UniProtKB/Swiss-Prot annotation:
The protein's name: Sulfate adenylyltransferase
Annotated site residues (Induces change in substrate recognition on ATP binding) in this chain: F330
Assigned EC number: 2.7.7.4
Region (N-terminal): 1-169
Binding residues for sulfate: Q197, R199, A295
Gene designation per UniProt: met3
Quaternary context: Homohexamer. Dimer of trimers.
Gene Ontology cellular component terms for the protein in this record: cytoplasm
Top class in the EC scheme: transferase
Length: 572
C-alpha cells in the first residue's frame, strides 16, 4: 500500500471539483483573468493534482511568512518552499483585485482557463528576507536572481478550484498524477517504493545507486525526473526522457518504473530537498534518495558553493519523523576497474584504483571521444550524442558591441564573407540599422526601447542558433543588462561570443563622414550613445578589439581563431 499523503489527505482538486466542472468553466469565462507564467503553470498543476498536498492554493501571507521563517505552514505542517502567485500593481489595478475577489487562472500557451482562485489576501513580500531565509542570500543564486529580476512586487494568496487539466503533448503516458501513480503501485503490488529525483541524464553509477538503495530496503524504484523548469544550461527534457527510457531495461526485471514530474525547481538545496521529499511522499513513495549537493545550483562566480555537500541530507534528517518518508542518504558511487564494480566512495579501501568522468569531460567526449561502457550504456550514449552534435555542426552567435561608427558593421560584413567561404553552415547578419528598420521601426531611443530592441535581436539570434546557423549581430547595445539578456537567451540554444569593438569615442567621431556625432553635439539628436547617453563597458567580453589600431582583416582573423579554438570550424 502506498505511503499516506503529506497532511493525511491527498488534495486532488481535479477529482474533487470534477462534478462541478461545467459550472466552474462557465463562471471562469465571466471572471477577470490572470495569465500564468511557465513557472506558475508548473506550480498550479502540482497544486491541482495533489503533488503539493496539503496545499489547496497559492500561499496567503500567514502561510508564506511561516514557511520562510520556520519551514512550516500556518497550521503547523512541515513545508519548506514558498508557493506563491506574483502579480504587478498594474495587473492588480487593471483587474480590480482585492480580498474575496474571484479570478480565472489562464494558460499562456493556449489561452485555456485552468482554475478559479478566491483571493484571501494580496500582500507585498519581503524579498530580502525570502532570499536570505529560503535560499541563503547569495545574490548570484539563480532563485534569488529570479526573485529580484522577474518576480512581481505583490503576491496573491488564495484557494483554488480546478477547471481544466493542463494540456501536455509530450510523454503523456509517463506524466502520472499522484493518484494515478498510487493506483499503479497498487496494481503492481508494490508496498515499498524508493523515489529517485534527477534533472540530468542517468548513467551506470545512477543505476547502481538506485538498485543498491532498493535492495537494501527490499523495495522497488520510482525514477522520477523533473521535466518542468530546471537549471539554465541543463540538457533538454526530451533528450533526457529518451535516455531514461533506454536505461530502464537495464534494471532487474520489474524493479523500476519511470514517471515524469512537471516541477519548476528553485535549486534551493536543503529547503528543496525537504520539498522534494514531500512531493514524492504525495506520489506514494515510502523512501527518497537524497544525494550529495541535492538540488544545489553549484557555485557562484567566486567558485564558492552555495550549499555544503551534505546540507540537504541534514535538513531532511531534521524533519524525518514529521515528513513520514524514509530518507536514503547516499554518497557518490565510483567505479573500481580491478573488480569491475561500483561502490559508494566511503566504502572504497585506501589505495584501491577508482575511475570517474566529470560532467565537463563527459560533454567533451560526447562531441568526439570514446565513452567507456563502465561509465554509461551504449544506448544512452547514442541518444545523448544525437542531441549533442559536434561543435562543427552547432550554431553560434557573434555579438559585436561598441559605439556607432566603431567599425562593427565593416567587421560584421567581412566576417560574414569569411564564414560563407568556410562553408558548413548558413550565416545570418543582423546589423543595427537593418534591425531598427525591419524589426524595431516603432521603437525610440529610451533605455527601455533600446533594451526591447536587443531583446528582439536576441530572440532572432537564439532561434537561428538553435537551427545551426552562424549569427553575426552588430548593434550598439550600450547597456550591460541588455547584453547579459542576449547572452543568457542565446546560450540556451548554442554558444554566444561577445566581441567588444572598443574603438575610442574620439576616433568614432573624427571618422564620422555622415556628421551624426556633430548633430548630436549640437543637440539636434537626443539620447545619443557617447554624447548624452552612456555606453557601459562590457564586464565579460570574450574578445576586445580596436578598429583605430587594427585592420578589419586582423580583427576578423582574431574572431576566426576564437571560433577555431572552440572547435566550431573543424571539417567533418
Amino acid at each position: 500500500m502506498a505511503n499516506a499523503p503529506h497532511g493525511g489527505v491527498l488534495k486532488d482538486l481535479l477529482a474533487r471539483d470534477a462534478p462541478r466542472q461545467a459550472e466552474l468553466a462557465a463562471e471562469a469565462e465571466s471572471l477577470p483573468a490572470v495569465t500564468l507564467t511557465e513557472r506558475q503553470l508548473c506550480d498550479l498543476e502540482l497544486i491541482m493534482n495533489g503533488g503539493f498536498s496539503p496545499l489547496e492554493g497559492f500561499m496567503n501571507q500567514a502561510d508564506y511568512d511561516r514557511v520562510c521563517e520556520d519551514n512550516r505552514l500556518a497550521d503547523g505542517n512541515v513545508f519548506s518552499m514558498p508557493i506563491t502567485l506574483d502579480a504587478s500593481q498594474e495587473v492588480i489595478d487593471e483587474k480590480k483585485l482585492q480580498a474575496a475577489s474571484r479570478i480565472t487562472l489562464r494558460d499562456f500557451r493556449d489561452d485555456r482557463n485552468l482554475a478559479i482562485l478566491t483571493i484571501d489576501d494580496i500582500y507585498r513580500p519581503d524579498k530580502t528576507k525570502e532570499a536570505k531565509l529560503v535560499f541563503g542570500g547569495d545574490p548570484e543564486h539563480p532563485a534569488i536572481v529570479y526573485l529580484n529580476n522577474t518576480v512581481k512586487e505583490f503576491y496573491i494568496g488564495g484557494k483554488i478550484e480546478a477547471v481544466n487539466k493542463l494540456n501536455h503533448y509530450d510523454y503523456v503516458a509517463l506524466r502520472y498524477t499522484p493518484a494515478e501513480l498510487r493506483v499503479h503501485f497498487d496494481k503492481l503490488g508494490w508496498s515499498r517504493v524508493v523515489a529517485f529525483q534527477t534533472r540530468n541524464p542517468m548513467h551506470r553509477a545512477h543505476r547502481e545507486l538506485t538498485v543498491r538503495a532498493a535492495r537494501s530496503r527490499q523495495a522497488n524504484v520510482l525514477i522520477h525526473p523533473v521535466v518542468g523548469l530546471t537549471k539554465p544550461g541543463d540538457i533538454d527534457h526530451f533528450t533526457r526522457v529518451r535516455a531514461y527510457q533506454a536505461l530502464l531495461p537495464r534494471y532487474p526485471n520489474g524493479m523500476a518504473v519511470l514517471g515524469l514530474l512537471g516541477l519548476a525547481m528553485r535549486m534551493g538545496g536543503p529547503r528543496e530537498a525537504i520539498w522534494h521529499a514531500i512531493i514524492r511522499k504525495n506520489h506514494g513513495a515510502t523512501h527518497f534518495i537524497v544525494g550529495r549537493d541535492h538540488a544545489g545550483p553549484g557555485s557562484n562566480s567566486k567558485g564558492e558553493d552555495f550549499y555544503g555537500p551534505y546540507d540537504a541530507q541534514h535538513a531532511v534528517e531534521k524533519y524525518k519523523d514529521e515528513l513520514g518518508i524514509e530518507v536514503v542518504e547516499f554518497q557518490m558511487v565510483t567505479y573500481l576497474p580491478d573488480t569491475d564494480e561500483y561502490r559508494p566512495v566511503d566504502q572504497v579501501p585506501a589505495g584501491v584504483k577508482t575511475l570517474n568522468i566529470s560532467g565537463t569531460e563527459l560533454r567533451r567526449r560526447l562531441r568526439s571521444a570514446h565513452i567507456p561502457e563502465w561509465f554509461s550504456y551504449p544506448e544512452v550514449v547514442k541518444i545523448l550524442r544525437e542531441s549533442n552534435p559536434p561543435r562543427a555542426t552547432q550554431g553560434f552567435t557573434i555579438f559585436l558591441t561598441g559605439y556607432m561608427n566603431s567599425g562593427k558593421d565593416a567587421i560584421a560584413r567581412a566576417l560574414q564573407v569569411t564564414l560563407n567561404q568556410q562553408g558548413g553552415r548558413s550565416v545570418s547578419l543582423l546589423l543595427g540599422d537593418t534591425v531598427r528598420h525591419e524589426l524595431s521601426s516603432e521603437l525610440g531611443f529610451t533605455r527601455e526601447d533600446r533594451h526591447t530592441n536587443i531583446q528582439r535581436i536576441a530572440f532572432v539570434a537564439t532561434e537561428l542558433t538553435r537551427a545551426g546557423a552562424a549569427v553575426i549581430a552588430a548593434p550598439i547595445a550600450p547597456y550591460e543588462e541588455s547584453r547579459k539578456f542576449a547572452r543568457d537567451a542565446v546560450s540556451q540554444a548554442g554558444s554566444f561570443f561577445l566581441v567588444h569593438v572598443a574603438t575610442p569615442l574620439e576616433h568614432c567621431e573624427q571618422s564620422d563622414k555622415r556628421g551624426i556625432y556633430a548633430a548630436a553635439r549640437r543637440g539636434e539628436i537626443k539620447g545619443f550613445t557617447g554624447v548624452d547617453d552612456p555606453y557601459e563597458t562590457p564586464e565579460k567580453a570574450d574578445l576586445v578589439v580596436d578598429f583605430s589600431k587594427q585592420s578589419v582583416r586582423s580583427i576578423v582573423h582574431e574572431i576566426i581563431l576564437v571560433l577555431e579554438s572552440q572547435g566550431f570550424l573543424e571539417r567533418q
